[in-house]
Amino acid sequence: MAVQQNKKSPSKRDMHRAHDFLTAPATAVEATTGEAHLRHHISPNGYYRGRKVVKTNND
């Protein structure tokens, strides 16, 4: 089993963890309906980049 040769200081430990935070997903707003959706995904009502690409139940 690997054993560290020297103890990692709290400063070095925290610098190592500096990028472990969570980021919010990137969202976009559909131009025609104003609905928010994930980037590069269709909106819940079937629009993508201003065009209807999927038929939904309320059509």
From Swiss-Prot:
Signal peptide (UniProt feature, chain positions): none
Keyword Transmembrane (UniProt): no
One Pfam family linked to the record: Ribosomal_L32p
Keyword field: Ribonucleoprotein, Ribosomal protein
Gene Ontology biological process terms in this record: translation
Highest taxon in the source lineage: Bacteria
GO molecular function, one term: structural constituent of ribosome
Gene Ontology CC entries for this record: large ribosomal subunit
Coiled coil: none
Family designation: Belongs to the bacterial ribosomal protein bL32 family.
Protein's name in the database: Large ribosomal subunit protein bL32
